[in-house]
């Protein structure tokens, strides 16, 4: 598709040549002379005025036609002003006749640009493959009326002449040339005719040569050999054409000098050729020898700038993700791009074998072909960084650094045989030499590794503690790590999570420091309390011994004892003695008068022979449900327990609630193991008759559910206790269900507290044995036994309020199948001290006991 101007030009030239061929030159000559006279002949004084008028008339004419102004208007005005001779008149008349004004389309209503053969939507992509270096060569065609006349001639005039020459070659060679020569001789001078024809031939040759060179230079990036051959062929063809034109006797330089554009055309063509060869892209002018439109030039420059930017980035990049060949996923079916991972280095010492200076590494990288890839690995500030923090940034191998040549001890190599003198083959000689060199390298590298390891050991004292933790987790030895890697590695986040940014790391470090400070203060407080408790326990144990020596049944001694027992349980050496003295005084009055002797009952059991099977089954079932299925079953059960329970079953009191627990824990306790079964029998019966007698149980059942009592005040405030605040769930029998879930150590401490709170001062009110002669147990109990049900109620209240989880009520507590379930909850943790947990339980119990 050709433009309006080109179609008019070609049509006019075609009609002109047909007229010349049919011998109608006489009719066309007067018309051409009239056109030449009307356009060219004007006084020299009116040159400037005529130029401005021509420009204004042209703008008015083009504006009225709704067509953009073309650079040819400036060309006509400049040529009219510069040429006043006959040759100039002939040229102006020819150009004006060859370039008529474009026709106006009456139906055109919008201001649209005329269609051209080189429109914006080009069909080829060769136009947009040039770089920005060649895009500036054709920018002179975009200049306005303020541009120089020479630039207008360079940009516009050769294209017109080239079109003329192209159409002239399309006709018959000899006939058309002779007819054209005859017509032009009659109308113009010989000099003007020679200038016109030589200009046409020169522009054709120069344009074709430039076009061929640009095309072949663009093809050089695909095949160098093919490009060179094509370039030689194009140069030979262009040289042949130039020789053909010069053989006709025409002088190319004379006509170019006539218009003043000889040097500029040659310089522009040279610049086009140089830029095309440098960037391996075609020139700005397309292959059809048509000038580009301004929009195409803009798109060309834009595309070239983008290509230059991409090439620059490509040269400066060190690594591309596309170059990484992933054969298979290393972590299952999950893509590596979906997982952040801090690089994990090996435990080898190869990372610090490189010790070259930055200057040596830069020189070595400049000699290497892969300098663009490895150049980025060298840090220019590594020497400064090394002096400050003793860190390494280099990853160049040990064998490739010239500075490490002195580290290789070649004296270790054995003497090699001389070829020709020794009977050694070349293969054996090379093999031995290779082994020797390898051994030298290995020994030298090991020696260097040891030296570097010693440096790491010396510098490890100045680094944070978290680096040692990272080393223990399997990461690289981070003793000589850089600051950048230290910022990424965080001991508060796993390595498979994304690294923290600076703000997040500061926030987390602040929170961690705060939490650690609070935890450290708590731990310091706990350690201090533990140390104080150890000192206090040891002091209280010594006081127990002193109280026994001073008479523990004194009123002052009992007051001190009641205070100390909440802090420290009785020792194994003093427990049995304290139990006996504070419950029945030193006279052991209850044991002598109201407890059946153990040896008599044992003899009775022996005389019975076979023990009743039903009773034996009941005792076995009692042991199974109360001990073996509970926390007590975690420890061995003494075989004497069955004997004691059988003896208790044939006694006058019989087996009461809690006998199996008391016998079991007293048998296991070191306080009573060495005393024998007789002493254990007496202690268990003494505790049952004084602390858990029938009167105490009756008062417990009556007071625990009292509406104005302490228990009702706590439990009635919470609706969750409305279903268990009754006699079926809370009574003296279900109270023992709590003791079934108590650990042995805490059980003995609880017994110590209960015994102490049921004691009385026998020193101030001693037992008068004559008063209780022939008196039953109820009479003695009413006179000398303290009934303290409050200590039992406070114990149950503590469990209901603070440890009521894992069971519905006290009645269902015995049905919990978990053997390890205990009160307080069993915590199998080395950082949790069982004594501390028990102390907290006792402290809460003391708090509720003070409420009664």
Curated annotation (Swiss-Prot):
Keywords: Cell wall biogenesis/degradation, Cytoplasm, Golgi apparatus, Phosphoprotein, Protein transport, Transport. One of its GO terms (cellular component) is cytoplasm. Residues 15-26 have a biased composition (Basic and acidic residues). The keyword Protein transport applies. One of its GO terms (biological process) is protein transport. Residues 1-158, 206-248 are annotated as: Disordered. Coiled coil: none annotated. The modification Phosphoserine is found at residues 72, 201, 459, 517, 520. It is found in: Cytoplasm; Golgi apparatus. Residues 124-139, 224-235 have a biased composition (Low complexity). Residues 43-61, 74-96 have a biased composition (Polar residues). InterPro entries: Sbe2/Sbe22_C, SBE2/SBE22_M, SBE2/SBE22_N. The keyword Cell wall biogenesis/degradation applies. Belongs to the SBE2 family. With SBE2, is involved in cell wall integrity and polarity processes like bud growth, through the transport of CHS3 and UTR2 to sites of growth. This is Protein SBE22. The gene is SBE22.
């Amino acid at each position: 598709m050709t433009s309006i101007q080109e179609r008019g030009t070609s049509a006019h030239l075609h009609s002109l040549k047909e007229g010349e061929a049919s011998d109608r030159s006489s009719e066309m000559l007067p018309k051409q002379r009239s056109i030449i006279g009307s356009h060219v002949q004007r006084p020299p004084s009116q040159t400037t005025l005529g130029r401005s008028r021509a420009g204004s008339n042209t703008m008015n004419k083009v504006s009225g036609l709704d067509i953009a102004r073309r650079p040819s208007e400036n060309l006509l005005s400049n040529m009219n002003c510069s040429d006043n001779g006959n040759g100039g008149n002939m040229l102006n008349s020819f150009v004006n006749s060859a370039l008529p004004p474009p026709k106006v389309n009456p139906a055109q209503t919008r201001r649209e640009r005329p269609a051209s053969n080189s429109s914006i939507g080009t069909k080829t992509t060769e136009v947009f493959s040039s770089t920005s270096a060649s895009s500036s060569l054709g920018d002179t065609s975009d200049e306005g009326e303020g541009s120089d006349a020479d630039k207008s001639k360079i940009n516009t005039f050769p294209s017109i002449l080239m079109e003329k020459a192209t159409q002239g070659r399309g006709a018959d060679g000899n006939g058309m040339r002779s007819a054209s020569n005859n017509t032009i001789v009659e109308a113009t001078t010989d000099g003007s005719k020679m200038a016109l024809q030589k200009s046409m031939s020169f522009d054709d040759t120069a344009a074709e040569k430039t076009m061929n060179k640009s095309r072949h230079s663009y093809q050089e990036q695909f095949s160098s050999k093919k490009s060179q051959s094509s370039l030689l062929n194009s140069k030979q063809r262009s040289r042949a054409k130039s020789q053909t034109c010069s053989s006709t006797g025409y002088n190319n330089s004379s006509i170019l000098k006539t218009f003043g554009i000889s040097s500029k055309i040659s310089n522009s063509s040279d610049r086009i050729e140089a830029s095309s060869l440098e960037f391996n892209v075609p020139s700005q002018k397309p292959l059809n020898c048509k000038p580009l439109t301004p929009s195409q030039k803009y798109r060309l420059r834009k595309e070239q700038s983008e290509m230059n930017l991409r090439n620059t980035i490509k040269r400066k990049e060190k690594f591309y993700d596309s170059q990484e060949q992933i054969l298979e996923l290393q972590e299952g079916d999950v893509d590596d791009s979906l997982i952040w991972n801090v690089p994990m280095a090996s435990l080898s010492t190869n990372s610090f074998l490189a010790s070259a200076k930055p200057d040596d590494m830069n020189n070595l990288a400049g000699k290497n072909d892969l300098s663009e890839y490895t150049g980025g690995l060298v840090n220019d500030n590594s020497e400064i960084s090394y002096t400050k923090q003793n860190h390494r940034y280099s990853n160049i191998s040990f064998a490739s650094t010239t500075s490490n040549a002195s580290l290789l001890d070649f004296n270790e190599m054995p003497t090699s045989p001389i070829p020709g003198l020794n009977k050694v083959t070349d293969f054996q000689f090379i093999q031995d030499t290779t082994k020797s060199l390898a051994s030298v390298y290995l020994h030298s590298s090991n020696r260097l590794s040891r030296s570097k390891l010693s440096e790491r050991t010396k510098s490890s004292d100045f680094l944070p503690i978290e680096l040692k933790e990272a080393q223990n987790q399997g990461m690289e030895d981070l003793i000589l790590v850089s600051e950048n890697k230290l910022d990424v590695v965080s001991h508060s986040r796993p390595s498979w999570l994304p690294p923290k940014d600076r703000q997040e790391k500061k926030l987390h470090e602040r929170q961690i420091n705060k939490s650690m400070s609070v935890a450290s203060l708590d731990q310091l407080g706990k350690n201090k309390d533990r140390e104080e408790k150890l000192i206090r326990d040891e002091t209280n144990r010594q006081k127990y011994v002193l109280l026994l020596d001073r008479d523990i049944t004194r009123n002052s001694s009992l007051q001190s004892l009641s205070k100390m027992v909440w802090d420290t349980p009785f020792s194994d050496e003093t427990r049995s003695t304290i139990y006996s003295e504070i419950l029945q005084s030193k006279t052991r009055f209850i044991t002598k008068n109201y407890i059946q002797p153990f040896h008599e009952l044992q003899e009775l059991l022996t005389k019975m022979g076979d023990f009743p099977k039903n009773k034996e089954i009941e005792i076995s079932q009692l042991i199974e449900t109360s001990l073996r299925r509970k926390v007590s079953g975690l420890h061995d059960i003494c075989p004497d327990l069955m004997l004691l329970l059988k003896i208790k079953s044939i006694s006058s009191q019989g087996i009461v609630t809690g006998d199996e627990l008391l016998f079991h824990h007293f048998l296991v306790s070191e306080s009573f193991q060495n005393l024998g079964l007789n002493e254990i029998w007496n202690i268990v019966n003494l505790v049952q008759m004084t602390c858990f007698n029938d009167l105490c149980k009756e008062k417990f059942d009556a007071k625990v559910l009292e509406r104005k009592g302490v228990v009702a005040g706590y439990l009635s405030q919470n609706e969750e206790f409305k279903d268990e605040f009754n006699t079926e769930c809370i009574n003296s029998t279900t109270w023992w269900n709590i003791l079934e879930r108590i650990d042995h150590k805490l059980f003995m401490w609880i017994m110590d507290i209960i015994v102490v709170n049921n004691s009385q001062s026998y020193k101030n009110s001693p037992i008068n044995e004559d008063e209780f002669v022939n008196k039953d147990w109820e009479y003695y109990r009413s006179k000398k036994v303290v009934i303290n049900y409050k200590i039992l109620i406070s114990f149950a209240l503590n469990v209901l309020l603070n440890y009521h989880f894992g069971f519905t009520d006290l009645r269902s507590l015995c049905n919990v199948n978990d053997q390890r379930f205990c009160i307080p909850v069993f915590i199998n943790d080395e950082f949790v001290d069982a004594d501390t947990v028990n102390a907290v339980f006792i402290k809460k119990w003391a708090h509720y006991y003070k409420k009664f």
